[in-house]
A protein has these predicted regions:
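Flexible, low-complexity linker/loop segments at domain and module junctions
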Residues: 1-8, 97, 266-272, 302-303, ...
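Active-site-proximal alpha-helical scaffold in enzymes
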Residues: 78-91, 140-168, 206-227, 316-338, ...
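Acyl-CoA/ACP chain-elongation machinery
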Residues: 168-203, 236-250, 278-287, 304-354
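Short pre-catalytic strand/loop immediately N-terminal to key active-site residues, enriched for Gly-Thr
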Residues: 130-135, 155-162, 199-203, 305-316, ...
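A glycine- and small-aliphatic-rich helix-loop capping segment at beta-alpha/alpha-beta transitions
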Residues: 22-27, 113-127, 177-189, 250-251, ...
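ACP-dependent fatty acid/polyketide chain-elongation machinery
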Residues: 1-67, 220-232, 327-342, 385-389
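Conserved beta-ketoacyl condensing-enzyme motif
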Residues: 8, 21-25, 29-165, 169-176, ...
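Condensing-enzyme catalytic core mediating Claisen C-C bond formation in acyl metabolism
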Residues: 5-9, 33-37, 190-266, 275, ...
Length: 389
């Protein structure tokens, strides 16, 4: 069966580095880190006091105020980012067949802060007093549902709950506390040393929030309407470590196999890849295993390609990580700029690739990879190709 070519024609994001693609990408190019003190709740009794929060987000800029009140924060992020992406793609949805327009938006946890608030309300006033919007605001698939409703998209609508593309907001006492208890978060109080992927002094990730949306379009359709094309999606791989519920398989075996699957699907040789937007969380196991996986797949070429983790600037956006990093990878190919891994100061002998420490690179590459590796052993890898027009 002949594969139809798929291109990226629109981008949208809300994340700790900015509330639009232009604002965020400019900050990433400057190497600005979005990590800072948690402002959403009192951290006096919390070990972890830093997070990568979205700043100055006004849902009313893109969402009707009455509708926004019925949405959890993660859904607001998704709808705002989707509105930007569709506008960026210059799509006139009234001229499209809505049954041919799908909506796929992930969330790792959904409306966790709403769960906390309504649980406390239920305990204090009785559970019959919780908000009638509690369930629809909380469930993880509501980001995709609300985007489909807003734009009248009647094709497949789904929400894969893995380390995939979508929206997330779980900077809350319960969310941060849960990750703290499992020793996944870096407890430092220094924002410049908190999210430091591949650094020998890394001590866990920094929780973040946001959304990243990409408009994917069949090439012929995009060309027929004269759409701007950021990059082409040429391959995809997905598998499972089936090893441990939080730890990666030894040596990054599952992640390596996932990259091989994606390259095979793309019909691309490893030596053709010039950049990897790594999962790069800043935990000891993830970064060393991902580095080992890259070496296993690329051999000596691993030392020639550029690898970076934009989580050094955004923190770990959980279910939104893949979407936001997909936006950055598409822009890296489109603009010929590979973002840095900021705040990487102390080399780790186990992590000895070119992670573009503290300075990005003006470099045009033909192929780039974006990796996402999630709890439960979920692995996903997308291969992007530079669009030459």
């Amino acid at each position: 069966m002949e594969k139809r070519r798929v291109v990226i024609t629109g981008l949208g994001t809300v994340n700790p580095t900015g509330n639009s693609v232009a604002e965020s990408w400019a900050a990433v190019r400057r190497g600005e880190c979005g990590v800072g003190p948690i402002t959403r709740y009192d951290t006096s009794n919390s070990k972890v006091k830093l997070a990568a929060e979205v700043k100055n987000f006004d849902p009313a800029a893109r969402i009707d105020k009455r509708e926004a009140r019925k949405m959890a924060r993660f859904t607001q992020f998704a709808v705002a980012a989707a509105a930007e992406a569709i506008e960026d793609a210059a799509l006139n949805l009234e001229q499209e067949d809505p049954t041919r327009c799908a909506t796929i938006i992930s969330s790792g946890i959904g409306g966790l802060p709403i769960m906390e608030e309504e649980c406390l309300k239920g305990e204090a006033k009785g559970y019959d007093k919780v908000s009638p919007f509690f369930v629809p605001m909380t469930i993880a698939n509501m980001a995709a549902g609300q985007v489909a409703i807003r734009f009248g998209l009647k094709g497949m609508c789904t929400s894969p709950v893995t380390a995939c593309a979508g929206a997330e907001s779980c900077i809350s006492p319960l969310g941060v506390g849960g990750f703290t208890s499992m020793k996944a978060l870096n407890p430092t109080d220094d924002p410049a040393r908190a999210s430091i992927p591949f650094d020998a002094e890394r001590g866990g990730f920094v929780i973040g929030e946001g959304a990243g949306i990409l408009v994917l379009e069949e090439l012929g359709h995009a060309q027929a309407r004269g759409a701007r094309i950021y990059a082409e999606v040429v391959g995809y791989g997905s598998n499972c470590d089936a090893y441990h519920f939080t730890a990666p398989a030894p040596g990054g075996a599952g992640g390596a196999d996932c990259m091989r699957l994606a390259l095979r699907d793309a019909g691309v040789q490893p030596e053709a890849v010039g950049y990897i937007n790594a999962h790069g969380t800043g935990t000891h196991l993830n970064d060393s295993c991902e580095t080992a996986a890259i070496k296993a797949v690329f051999g000596e070429h691993a030392y020639k390609l550029a690898v970076s983790s934009t989580k050094s600037m955004t923190g770990h956006l959980l279910g939104a990580a893949g979407g936001v990093e997909g936006v950055f990878t598409a822009l890296a190919l489109h603009d010929g700029y590979l973002p840095a891994t900021v705040n990487l100061r102390v080399p780790d002998p186990e992590c000895d690739l070119n992670y573009l420490p503290n300075e990005g690179a003006e470099r045009q590459v033909e192929y780039a990879i974006s990796d996402s590796l999630g709890f439960g052993g979920h692995n996903a890898c997308v291969v992007f190709k530079h669009w030459e027009g």
